[in-house]
Each structure stands twice: as structure tokens, then as C-alpha cells.
Amino acid sequence: MPYNPKEIEQWYKENYKYFFGEGDKILIIDTPPPYPAPLWHIGAALSYALQDFIARGFRKLGYKVIFPEGFDGNGIPIEMYLEKYEKIPFGSIDREEYIKKCRQILDSWREKMDKILKDLLLSMDFEHRYNTDDPEYRALTQKTFAELWEKGLIYEAEYPINYCPHCKTAIADAEIERKIKKTKLVYIKFKIKDSDDYITVATTRPELLGACKAIIVHPDDERYKKYHNKIAIVPYYNREIPIIPHKMADPNFGTGAVMICSYGDWVDVQIFRELQLKPEKIIDENGRLTIEPVKGLTTKEGREKMIEVLKQLGVVEKIEEIEHSVPVHERCETEIEIIPMKEFYLKQLPFKEEIKKLSKEIEFIPERYRKNLENWIDSITIDWPISRRRWYATEIPLWYCPKCGYIHVAKDGKYHQPWKEEMVCPRCNTKMVGETRVLDTWMDSSITIYYLIKKYSKILGIDEEGLFNNYTLRPQGYEIIRTWLYYTLLRVYQLTGKKAFDFVVINGMGLDKHGRKMSKRYGNVIEPETLLEKYGADTLRYWFAMEISIGEDYRINEQKIAGIMKFMNKVWNIANYISQYQYRETQNLKPTDEWIINYVKYLENKAIEYIRNFEFNKLARELYRFVWDVFANHYIELTKKRAKNNDDSAIYALYFVFERVLNMLSIFSPGIAKYLAKKLYNKDIEKEKLKYWGKVRLDLLYKGEKLIEFNNYVWKLKTSQGKKLKDPISIEIPKELEIFKEDLILLHNIQ
């Protein structure tokens, strides 16, 4: 029958059962739990195919492989969806009902994504799926909070913090992106006290003038040496502030004189601390200004208002239109403000050097991404703010006694919701007040490997320590090195004293055919279902295997995918051809058969090396060339007449070689490989390991390449002479190909 990918892949899914693999070594893949979404683009989905290549490849090498299915779910994204599409703003309905709606939507998206993962023919453990917003998982997050609280690594303090006015919550540095935006650079004149002179300051934040407590100039800037330690008067507010020489001032920006406002940016915060200036909070938690003449306005509105006020005062020297980089919240792209808030922090500054040292014990693939992690660690200047003023996330497991001040932390390993659970103070018997804040979603996501160790130690009957002492691997995108990877290394080290991973494999990003990132804004998002329906998983996976180079972005090219569909048909047709012959054993191999068997052994030896080095694209490309250009186009053509005459050697070689091909092919295209292996060999090819064959005959491989060259030459010669390929030809067989003489005469009809 003709190749029908839908039927084959449906058969595969119906017969699928998770297989850990066989061997003493264990590889634990910390599968990235994707955040559920209504639209999942093909690049994101295909990253899981790469993880599947790793899982299948290492099973072939004799590892037991833990390859779990998991989904994220905590945090702001679902809350933003509720606000934008369900028209349910945060805080507009009962908290319990709000949480229920979030969960219902997430679960519906998860089912859709689960189907895609299965349609991709992943060898995942679908039976033991986890969600980071399940009570079981959240209970572990809370337990780790309690452990670190007891160790003194978590504390509450009021510090200036990155704050998103839209999401109304604190966020960590790792959640910030930089965007280039147009703005106004306003040149404002400050009068020098007891003088007719003015010093002009250029600023993009005139709305913060009420929080200005100093002006700095560079010590070596000759223009301002006469003003060192003089007093300037803040326009409108008539506040006296010092002019201070400071190396943080950039003489080349604006006028070289810089106004220092409490919470203008992190440089301002640093200088305030250094100079021991008293800060003033003029932005509230709604992102609105709190002092006149801009009271009640957003910072953007206040900016325009203050410019008008300053113009009326005659202190605006000029205004320039510029572009500059501003920090925005990665989730909603709202510009970040810095405001002082009381939040919980996890200590990370004392661990920076330890995590860097630990990371040197991890193998990065590709190696260059190690630097991304190190650069991020070097850039950290504050502890990690881990509390959020939202609802759909893991609750902070604390209760407070309003009478005696006792703080209770839940350490029982159960999931708690303090905002609705009653607790009586064990010291004074007073009703306690439950914490209403939740944890940063990365507090959950950063313990996936920790959770998996605990979960699978029970499933496999291995103690946690023993399982952790095996091999752990983290596959992930480069864009979350600073978040998921760093936070996991930090958290696991704080909890266990161990490195979280032996290997970190960084995948690139799937782009459209023009090299652009897929985005709804560009209208270039390709959904996995579209390509799976059109080409099938085996084809799509094999194209991806050939295309991807680990750590590099790649382009989705349908023309190339369609080309791989032809390859699948070629594999199918080879199987049909072989199936017409009855398998037979023989020890008496003819040279051509010995050559092709030698070749496939050589390829299988290389396959083992490629898998160990995570070079799946090289294996896929070499297997493709072998099947199409060598096995089908040359070997099968050379031996057709012998096989037709039931030659033992030819038929044995056909069966032997194709079984080895299917074994390697099953890493990339498991549906067709499993189906054909079952039909031809009555074997479950997924459970078959790769075999290392030792030394192979390189002289025979060399002669094989010359054999291919000779075949191509003869076919081209016949075509140029207007002959059919079956027509006779008079040509001398090269001496080095004498061992193949019998098959060459039959193939080319050499007279």
C-alpha cells in the first residue's frame, strides 16, 4: 500500500507506551514546562522535538531516560488574558472565583498543547504529567520557601524596587526588557543661590522634579568647576539642593549636569545611598504622581504638564526629540517605575560567586552560552524580590499574630492558602492574619528538576540522593538563561548544596522564512497543527533534525519540509521492495553486500558519537544521504538482479542494512520506523539500542565511494549518447573496482 502518514502515526499513538529505556545509567531531562497559550507557534513546539531526539538517542546508548511532560501555569500571563479578553480586571471579582476562572482557561489550553505534543510523536511520560499550579507542586514550592525561611535566606524589607504600574506588582530584574522609545529631552534652568547664574540640566523625566535632591557634574568638567558644592534652586518647588562633583555624571550627555531624583532610575538610587540623601516618594502604586502640580496624573501625563508649567516659569531653555532605551515589563511592556515597597527577598548576592563556580562544572552546549549566564550573574546588584501582589500563583505560606507578633510558616508539606485559611496563634491563642501576597512564578519554575527528582525516585523505587547522582540535563532557549536557568541553579544549590545539571543544551528560535521572529503582530505565526496535518510528524521531525544546529536560530521552510516528505516515501518504498523477499541468513557475503554492511556499521558507529555530542543534525544528514544516495540509488540498483534470483547474500544485506537504518531513523521519525520494523522484523525498534561495531574496513568504504563515482559516470555517459540506462555499453571497469565486477556488469549491461 502507498505511504499514508496519518494512518501510520495514528497507529503509533494508539500503540504508544512510555519506555524508560534499559541500562544502569539514568538521564533526567528537565523538560521545560511551557506556559499554556491559546496559540502555540511551530518553533516553540519543535523545541520539544529536539528534546525528544535527546531522549530517544540516549535510550539507544543504554540509558534509562526520564522525559516528563509538564506545564507551567502560575503568574501574570493568565491574569493579563482575563483582563484583556474576558474583561475581568484584577480585583474586580471574588478571589476564589478569579482563581477558578484562571484554572479553567489554563486547563483548556493545556489539553490542546498536550495533543500537539502527542501528535509530534514525542516519547514523553504522558502518564505522569505535572502542572506547576497543581496543589501537589505548589505544596513543594511552599515547603522550599519554609526551608529557606528557616535558614534565614528569605527576609522582608522595604527597598526601592522595580514596579509595574499596570500589573500593580513588584518584579525582578530578570523580568525586565529594554525598549527604544521616542521621548523629549528637556533642558531646565536651575538658579544658583545668591547669584544671577543658572545651571542647565537636561532630563527626560521633568515630572520627577519634585523628587530632585541634588545635581551632579563630572569633577573634571571645566564648565562646572565654579559651581562645585554650590546650591541650586529647584524650579517651581524652590527647594535648595547641592551641586556635587561626581564621576557618574556624563559630560557628553545633555549639558553634562544631571539632576538626581529619588527613584528616577537605579543610578539615582545608588547615588542617593552613597550621598545619604533623603528620598521622597512621589509615585504611588497605581503609577500616579502624588505632588502638585502633577498630582493624580500618570507619569506620561505629568511629564507634559510639568513641561507646560516650567515653560510658564521661563526656565525651559530648549526641548529635543530623542530616542532612548527604557525598561519595560516583559509581560505587558509597561514602562517600569522604581518605588519603595515592603516585599520579601531571597538572598542571592552572597551566592553569586558560588553559582558562577558551580556553573563551571556544567557542560554547556554550545559552550558560548556559558558567558550569557556569567554576564547575568555579574550584573546582579540586589537580592531577588520574590513576593507579588497578585492572585494566580503559589501563596506565601505565612500567618501573622496581630497581638504578640508571632509569624507562623507552614512546614507540613501541604498546600496552603493563608488568605482564606484560619489559623490560631500557638503562643497567645489569637486569631492570626494570613498573608495575601503570592510568590514570583520563577519560585515555582526554578524547582522543576527538584520536583522531578522527588517524583521519579518514588516511581522508579530509587532514593532521591541516588537519582540525583545520575545525569541531569536542562534543554531550554537562550532567552531564559537569566531567569529559568539562573534561578534553578540558585534554588537547587540553596536547597541541596548541589549543581542542578550536568548538561545545559540551548536551542535556537524558530523564525519565519524571511528570518523574522514569529509574532501575531507580523501575522507570520505558523501553528503546529497546520504542518502536522499537511506533512505528518515523521516528515516534520526529520526536516527539523536536518535543519537545526543546537544554539542557532533556524527558518521554517515549507519547501524543504515537502522535500523530506519525498524521503519518507523513499523509505516506505524501500521497505515494500525488501518485503517481497524472504529473509535468509548467510556467512558468505559478496563484495558489494560486504561494502554496504560495512558502510551502515560505520554510520552506526558515528551515530553513537553524534548523539553523545548532541549533533543530531549531522546524524540526520548523513542518514539521509546514506538511505537515498547510497543504499537506494546505488546498492539496491546494483543488486536487483541478484535479489530477484534469490541470492542469499544480497537479501541478507538488504534486511541487515535496513534494520540498522530503521533503528537510527526511529530517533527522528518514530512512526514510520516503528511500523516498518514491526512489519519486516517483528521488533519494537524503539527498544533496540545502537551497536558499536568496532573497526570497519576503511579500504572498502573508499572503494565504495569510487563505485558510486563510476556508476554516476556510466549513467551520465549513456544519457549523453542518447542511450537508455538498460542499453548495453562497452566500457572498461577500473581495476580497483574489480571486486564489484559481477554487479557492475549486470547493472550497466557492460559488453
From Swiss-Prot:
GO terms for molecular function: aminoacyl-tRNA deacylase activity; ATP binding; valine-tRNA ligase activity. Its main location: cytoplasm. Its EC number is 6.1.1.9. It comes from the Archaea. ATP binds at residue 520. It is found in: Cytoplasm. The keyword ATP-binding applies. CDD domains: Anticodon_Ia_Val. The keyword Ribonucleoprotein does not apply. GO terms for cellular component: cytosol. InterPro entries: aa-tRNA-synth_Ia, Anticodon_Ia_Val, M/V/L/I-tRNA-synth_anticd-bd, Rossmann-like_a/b/a_fold, tRNAsynth_Ia_anticodon-bd, Val/Leu/Ile-tRNA-synth_edit, Valyl-tRNA_ligase. One of its GO terms (biological process) is valyl-tRNA aminoacylation. Belongs to the class-I aminoacyl-tRNA synthetase family. ValS type 2 subfamily. This is Valine--tRNA ligase. It comes from Nanoarchaeum equitans (strain Kin4-M). The gene is valS.
